[in-house]
Amino acid sequence: ELDQISANCKALGAEVEALNVRPSTEAICDEIIAAGVKRFGRVDILVVASGKNDVSKIDQMAPERFLDVMDANVTQSWLMAKAATKQMLAQGQGGKIILMSSARGLLGHPAGYTAYCASKSAVDGITKALGCELGPTGITVNAIAPTVFRSPLTAWMFADDEKATTTRAGFLARVPKGRLGEPEDLAGPLLFLASRASDFYTGHILYADGGYTSG
């Protein structure tokens, strides 16, 4: 999958430095940023788009599973933000940090989402706190909070079988736009937050959710 993403980017004329690593320690995150600096000379934009979900009722979830979700969604976002911040501060020209939250950071869910909801609420907290902390430096920190988007993890919701149809209908009843999200729907918010157009925005959570959280 990483090779395919790299190939797609190169086909669009972009230079690519692909690293197949998990940002699980401070040292690894520093190495990721250093690789970007080595290849491109500097780092101006960080997008932390990885994440994990583990759905289970609280009485059936082992603490290790809860902590694993928190590590993937919270700790690794924090570590990457820290590594990028150090580089951006050294460069002295500001920068853009974009984290990936979720509508579940704002809203609960009855189907066993305690780990995921808690982790995305924490991402929102990191975003707001860093927005305040780094505001004077010219580094903006914002997050995008999607709802259900087409991805390998949600592909089943886009199917035509009875389970998907029933689940989708119940969910879409709360989405004013009347459809699920497509990857293209994230392009605009990402471009905005990565560009000079968002220079006066920091500490914000941008809900790319078709109006789901408005009701």
Task: List each language-model region with its residue ranges.
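Active-site loop-to-helix junction immediately N-terminal to the catalytic Tyr of the SDR YXXXK motif
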Residues: 61, 108-117, 129, 157
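Active-site helix of classical SDR
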Residues: 81, 119, 127
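A glycine/serine/threonine-rich, flexible loop-to-helix segment
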Residues: 136, 148-175, 185
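Alpha-helical segment proximal to the catalytic Tyr-Lys
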Residues: 86, 132-136, 199
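Substrate-binding pocket helix/loop in short-chain dehydrogenase/reductase
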Residues: 29, 57-58, 62-70, 171
